[in-house]
Regions:
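Hinge/beta->alpha junction and helix N-cap segments in small-molecule ligand-binding domains
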Residues: 56, 74-83, 101-109, 159-169, ...
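Alpha-helical recognition/docking segments in bacterial nutrient-uptake
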Residues: 64, 68-172, 233-238, 242
Length: 330
């Protein structure tokens, strides 16, 4: 007979004819080799019949696992971060709750944002594309893993996007098409990921006939289009025939500016391979950083760390160049 009111571990134990500790082992997934298979099945049957749901707060006192993983990210409106979160959520499954911690203003976070994440007493934290000051000042309070912060990340396991390969893939593709004059557009950002993207490409084309660079203060494609409409004429007159952007959002602005100028023959490449890149005209050639895959790897690594106490190794997720019409190769 099912009792009214909240069902607890004691009721499950009575129903299954076992101890409360046996119930705890089963519901926390720690029963392997410690109780019989027959007892495990009895406990699971009682859990199902009674509709028992473990009290997460009580469980955290015993296991040290609050059941919450915090993801700290810069800009929730950027579809790339949505891909990372989707992969992270898939890896965490039903066992952990994914809590998003966002900047209170602007499109980037600082050390205070990370402190807000730690104040939730999470089982683990994932920092997505953090800036240099965040990494420099960070004092981890629980298993903390970084996604997309290449370079010297002190004392933190990380999942890297292959930003170095991105520069190589783009430069090899464009030079194979005969381009010798390049423009590069990036953000005014302290983030390691954008420094690496910039350096990887510019080092690869250091002997180009023409090389122009520009840093923009934001990611708004419309603002980028306005700025580039005034900059591109000089670039093109100097011999620039291909423009590379550190992010697809900037590339959309470049495509719009080129369309306004009637210079559709200029090649444009982005990074991130956002969903809209297939739909814009011309369709944008872009580097796919496999954001969903990076999120899955980060989630699995963090869960293993939480469960075993063993720090995961650094992982790099391969990048791939998706060639489309904007470089006349697709």
């Amino acid at each position: 007979m099912v009792r009214e009111g909240r069902i607890g571990a004691r009721e499950v134990a009575e129903h299954a004819g076992c101890s409360v500790s046996a119930v705890s082992l089963v519901v926390n997934g720690k029963d392997t080799g410690r109780i019989s298979a027959e007892l495990r099945e009895r406990v699971l049957a009682a859990v199902t019949e009674l509709g028992y749901r473990p009290n997460r707060s009580a469980r955290s006192l015993v296991t040290g696992d609050s059941g919450t993983v915090c993801a700290v990210l810069p800009d929730p409106a950027n579809p790339f971060f949505g891909d990372v979160l989707a992969g992270l959520g898939t890896a965490l499954g039903d066992e952990h709750t994914l809590a998003l911690v966002l900047p209170t203003s602007g499109t980037d976070y600082d050390a205070r944002t990370v402190l807000r994440a730690y104040s939730l007493d999470p089982a683990g934290v994932v920092l997505i594309s953090p800036g240099e000051p965040v990494l420099r000042d960070l004092v981890p309070r629980c298993p903390t893993l970084v996604v997309d912060a290449p370079g010297r990340t002190p004392a933190l396991p990380r999942v890297d996007l292959d930003t170095v390969a991105a520069g190589e893939l783009i430069s090899d593709h464009l030079t194979a098409l005969g381009h010798r004059g390049f423009g590069y557009i990036g953000p005014t950002s302290d983030k390691p990921t954008f420094r690496t993207r910039r350096r990887a490409f510019l080092d690869r084309v250091a002997d180009a006939d023409v090389l122009r660079t520009l840093d923009l203060p934001g990611w708004d494609p419309l603002a980028a289009a306005v700025t580039m409409a005034s900059v591109l004429p000089e670039w093109l007159d100097s011999g620039v025939t291909a423009v590379v952007c550190a992010d697809d959002l900037l590339a959309y602005g470049v495509l719009a500016a080129l369309d306004r100028l009637g210079r559709g023959e200029v090649a444009v490449v982005g990074m991130g391979d956002l969903p809209f890149s297939q739909l814009c005209r011309p369709a944008l050639t872009s580097v796919d950083f496999a954001g969903r895959r990076a999120g899955e790897v980060a989630g699995r690594s963090l869960l293993s760390w939480i469960g075993t106490g063993e720090r995961p190794r650094r992982t790099r997720v391969p990048a791939n160049l998706v060639v489309r019409a904007s470089t006349r190769g697709g």
